[in-house]
Every structure is written in structure tokens, then in C-alpha cells.
């Protein structure tokens, strides 16, 4: 019989693994230094340190030395897995370890030189699996080693952020030396990973490997691990933490009650107020993160790498780490709020995004930490109601701030943010929260509640993740469901955000208050959800019916289901259930993006233009989860009179705030054109990149200033569909139309799968129709055809149009034919404000400017155009200017001045209106563009290309 102490396993693993990487590095440095530090962009001396991939996989003999030594690591590696399994008895942990080991073999033996994509897939898989592996191993470790492992794991994942940053600097910015700095962090991950497994030494000393013959003749065993009994440090530690937590609560309860009596009960004023704010903070941070992420793929025109910040929603996974759950219980609201809201101080967009991701991660984890311990029925409903009222408060506040949340990091004091006020409130309620919410951790699991099966937990997790997505997609702004129903102006057009956004807020408030009636009774809400989803998915149902029976009914059904979910989740305390919920939420968010961004993402065709499918799946999962909740819910709740008195007070406060905001954002008067004496229409076209400027700040105020300065009567805005999760569910027309005192038509809605277009007009919009142009391959091209009532009741047609991508030639050909026919079908004077992606005088240009369309170019001699074009017909062209964008967006503002003529004047001018001949000064002073943008201009705006405006006879 041979007995070997288990400590030899981590020792052998550490020696073999470290030797493999170290030997390859030394050999590579000695033989091929210049070759292994060379990358796609730079070589020595700009780069001076090799990446792991270049070191282990590019050259002989270091590649062979590495692979031999790493092969020797396999035996102690699998012994390490078996030893951990014996100690913690966790099959899930063992399975993750095996998959992690296989993925390690993938990126080790398939190098980046062999197949770059496969190598990266295995590498990413390995890093992703390292998270649950480190957490579970740390959780199940003895107290002696858990701190060391926890610290090592924390440093490991903290190192990922600067590593990703420097990789982007290398691959996207092509910055010299960036790859060497990236390599430092990459090698640090290797050392930290080896060190983490080395800390198993203390745990493995407690076991022996026994090699012996079996007592039965003829039978032998390869080996067995012998010990008196399995040691489950995780259970011991969990028990200790739970006991210490119970003691802590017991200590705090008398202190709180002696100081404030019953103020800290579930029906107390302070409990309700604090958790309404916490609910508001939750939704503010959750919506802020995705709104910030969107800036990066937008400006990189593709996947940038910063999208990984979406993993911040998986904050609950950190509750597995020792002492983290207790820390978040005490300081989660405070830390999460300060970091996420305070991120506005950070000027660099990349670092601001990381700050928001960290803060949101803590906020989400703190929410989960509270929710998973609430087992009392009354406390559960009180917590659910305050969470809903926090949601309603955020929606009302967004309505009052023109659909921007004033706590978001895309705002500061310069563009309407109230970040400092939010920080003060966060500190106040963050300090109150651990005391007020101590009641959430009281009580035991109700004896009447049924234990959930694994399948039940899965359904509950998937349902809750879908519920979060559904609320975020349609119910985080008062105008989202309105725009799902909007089809343009006509005699019986649908609701507009003002004043009907207030109805959305009121219905959401009603649904929140009445949700107590449906706690544990999901059948009616599920039926309403089924009906409303069908209405929202039906493209034939539009305007008021879609808003009422789709949008409002959906809001009622969703909010009625929340208390049932909260009650059931309180009976299921497993952290993985919540991690799975937010994973499902992330998957649905990506699907929500894929339906529009299919041309820019892998496998985009799968979900192309299928928002209804995404909605249907989410509603189906919500219903299945809700029916599962029914089996887990405890007895009916009975809330006292005092509770409803306080709730009534908060409801009245929210209704009053709604009324105040409706009054504040009312139209300021009847819009009037700037130059009625000359009967001028000053029209512009501008691509505004979804209202986010180059530095990730909301740009509405700066856009308003330029539009005012240029005295635009009509403006077409492109890339405006911000009524999506990733754009913050914002309505750019809300503030623009209000502050500019203009009518607004929000083009094809968020359920039409376009990037959006908007028409703002000083003239009444008599009629407007929305068009989706042929796009068999690329992105959908949106268009608005609006008829404006101008001077002397002369009707003028305005077309706002965004064509497809440069790569999709057939799409653009079909779209040009469609637009030419659409413009040619009307004989009224017309203006096209467009984004055509064509050279002047070439290709599809000759379809837009043709006998079929009847349209003419505002200046055929301007040959420095590709994207934006202004065409016209039946109007007298008097001026044309191109204005630099500043840092608002990536595209200039083009402006044309046109004079509306009487029928007699039209006959007199006839074809002379289209003759070319420009001047440096206008015919009349009233027709002049502002001088402030001559020369260097103001605020980064100046006349460019011609360096001054052009005027025409």
C-alpha cells in the first residue's frame, strides 16, 4: 500500500503549469525576441513584451517545450478536480472544472496562429468559466484559504478591465506600445490563475491518496482517496455566516425599535420611503448602464469590446464570495448609488462606462440580497410595491425631464442633470437602508410554502429575467408604448406623448397599487398579458387600439405579476436562480438589439426584424414563471390600515408630480416660422447619432442651440429611434419640439426595426405617412412623407429619408426607385431631406434627381457630398449652407432656404427656378444666413466646404 499526502497535487500542478509558461517565455526571449513582440501594427522598439499567445504558439522550440510541459500538467490537474469534488461534494463545481480544463486545452493547443477565432473562443470560454469556478471553490474552501483565494480571484477579474482597455487601444486605436501593456495584464492573469489553484495546498493536506490492492483476491483498485468523512467547508461557512447574520439582526432590532418605535416595520413610513427611493435607484442605474454602452458600438460602427460591460448585470454572482453578501447588505445601496451616479464626474467615456457598470453591479446584487431573504408575506408585498413605485417615479421623472433621467451619467449640470442632488439623496437613503431593511432578513421560511423543484426554479428564474426585460423594454418611459402605436398624422391619428404620457404613468401607478389583489393569483394577469402581447405583435392594429389594448393592458398585466414573483423568489434563496434571471435578461436585451442591428452583429439574420417574436417569447416565459409562482406563494397578505394610508400619501404625491410635469412640458404656443414676410422655408437635414455626442453626453441642448441659430423652420433628423433599451428609451423630439416650439413627427416607431427619422416643423403637419423601403439584404430604410400647411395655406410636401448602407447596392437601387415614385406621385411643391450614400451625378443619384421624381438638386456643383442631400421642386431656392457639426455628432448640418411662391409666380419663374447661379450675398437681408458661423464660427460650428453660405438668384 502506498499513501501520498494530497498536498502533492497542488504542488505538482503549480510546478508544471508555471514551468510551461516560464520556459516558453525564456526560450522565446532568447531565440525570437523581435519576432514574438511583433504584432499586426508595430514591432520593436514600439512593442517590447510578447503576449501569451505569441510566446506559446508561434515559434519552435518554445511551442513544443510549452506543450510538453502543459501536457504533464494534465494529470495533477484532474487530480485537483477530483480532490475538490471529494472535499465539497459539488457536482456543478466538478462539471465547471472539467469544462474549464477542456477549454484550457483548446486555447493551449490551438494557437492564434493556427486559428485565431477558435483560439479566442476557447480563451473567452475559459475566462467565463473561471468566474463560477473561483467563486464556488472559494465558497467551499476552509477559512484558512478562502481569504487568499477570494483576494486572488478579485484581483484576477479586476485585471480584466484594464486588459480589455489596452486591447482596444491596440486593435481599434492602433496605439503604439498598447499591446505590450496588454501583455503585462495577460501574463498577470496566468500567474493569478496558477496562484489560485496553488492555495488548495492547505485544504489538500487533510486528505491522502491511497494506492492499494483490494482485499478481495483478483481485484485491484487504481487509487482511492481516504478520509474519515467529506469536509464541506461551504456548508460550515454558510451556517456560520447565517448565524452571525441572525445575531446581527437580533442586535439591531431592539436598537432600531427603541429609537423609533415601529418606524422600521414593513408598513412604516421610513420603510416605504426608503425602498421607493431604492427602487428608483435600481431602475435609474439599470437603464443608465445600457444607455452608456450604446455609445461605443455606435462610434466604432461595430462591436467595440466595451459591450462586455453588460455583464455588470450579473452582480448577484458576487454574493457567492465570502463576506460580500454581508457587505452589500450594509453598504450596497450607498456604494452602488455613489459609484453609478457619481460616474458623471469621470470625463473619459470608457472609464465612465466602467464606473456605471461597477455601480450597477452592486445595485443589482443589493436588490437580490434583500429580495432573496424576504419570507414574510406582508414584507414581501411591501418590498414589491415600493420597487414598483420606484419604477413609476423614474418614469414620471423622465417625463418631466423630456425622457432623460436626471441621474444618468450622460447628463450633468450643463445639459439638465441633477446628479449632485441624486448623490445627496443616495447618501441619505444609503445610510438608512441597512437599518430600515433589517426586517427583510427576519423570519423563517413559511411552513405552508412548497419547496421548489429544480425545474420550478428554472422556470421561475427564466420568467423573472423575462419580466425584467419586458418592463425595461416597454415600461421605463411614458412614451414608448405610444410610439409603438404611432403611424403619423391624419384625421384620426393616435395618442401623442403630450399629454397622453401622463395616462401611461397613471395606469402604471394604478396597476402598482392594485397588484396586492393578484399576489399568488396569476391567472388574470397572465390572460391580460397574453391579450396585450397579441395586440402589440399585430402590425395591423395601430393608433389608439394598439396603445390602449396593447400598451396600457401590457403595463397592467406586467405590474400585477411582480408581487407574485417577489413572493416566490423569497422562498427560493439560491443565488444561481438570480444569476440565471439576469443572464436571461441579458440574452433578451441582446435579442432586442439584434432585431435592428442585424447587419452589424454575428448571426444577425436569425432575429432580423423579429421584435414581435422576442416579445412573444418573453411573455411566454413570464406566464410560465408566473404559474410556477402560484405553487410557491405563501398565504394571502393582509395589509393594515396604516400601510394603505402611507401608500395613499405616496400615490397622491406621484400623481401631483405627474400633473406638475404635464403642465411644465406643455407646448409653449403656436409655432411660427422665422421669416414670414419673405415667405421663407429654411429646411435642414442632420444625422444626430441618437442624441449622444462624441464624449457620451446627451446632445439635445446643443442641437437646439444650433437649430435656433440657423433659424430652421423645417428639419429632418436621422438616426433618432432612441425608444429602445440600449438608447435609454428616450424621445428626442420631446425636448427638441418643446424648446424649439415646433410640431414633431416621430418616424417609423421602435417596433418597425429602423434607426429612425424625425420631422420637426414650424408649419402645421396636415398629414404624414411612414414608409419602410425595400431592404432585402441590409438595414431597413425609413422615410416620412409629410404635407405641411405653409404660407397662404400652400401645401408643401416634405420627405425625410435615410437610405441603406453603402455595401448593399441592390437595396439602395430599390430604395431609390421607391423614393422617386413616391416623390413623383405628388404635384405639390416638395423638399427632400435625405441621406443617400451616393456621389453627385452618379449611380442612384440620377434616380432621385430625375423626371420620375421631378426633383432637383439644391446645388449640382457641390461635388463634395456623399451622405446628406437636399432636393426640391416647385419652390424658389434662395440659399444653401453646410455647417460643421462640432462635437455633437459625426455628420454636418446641411441647410437650404426656399421661398414659397404663388401660383402666378410659379408660372412666371417656371424652369428658371432650377437654373444655377450663386452669389455671396442674398437678394434681401431677410434671406441671409447668420454671420456668427463665418470664419472660425462658434462652439465648433462654422460654414465649411464653401467657407460661407451660397445664395441664388
Swiss-Prot record:
Q: Identify the stretch(es) annotated as Required for function in lipid remodeling.
A: 862-882
Substituting residue 472 to A results in: No effect on introduction of ceramides into the GPI anchor
Q: What's the reported outcome of changing residue 57 to R?
A: Causes destabilization of the protein and induces the release of cell wall proteins in the culture medium
Reported impact of residue 862 to A:
Impairs the introduction of ceramides into the GPI anchor
Record field: transmembrane: 65-85, 92-112, 118-138, 150-170, 176-196, 279-299, 308-328, 331-351, 353-368, 381-401, 421-441, 451-471, 496-516, 518-538, 548-568, 586-606, 614-634, 643-663
A GO CC term attached to the entry: endoplasmic reticulum
Cite the effect that the entry attributes to residue 807 to A: No effect on introduction of ceramides into the GPI anchor
- Domain notes, please? The PGAP2-like region interacts with the PGAP2IP-like region.
Protein's UniProt name: Protein CWH43
Protein species of origin: Saccharomyces cerevisiae (strain ATCC 204508 / S288c)
The coding gene here is CWH43
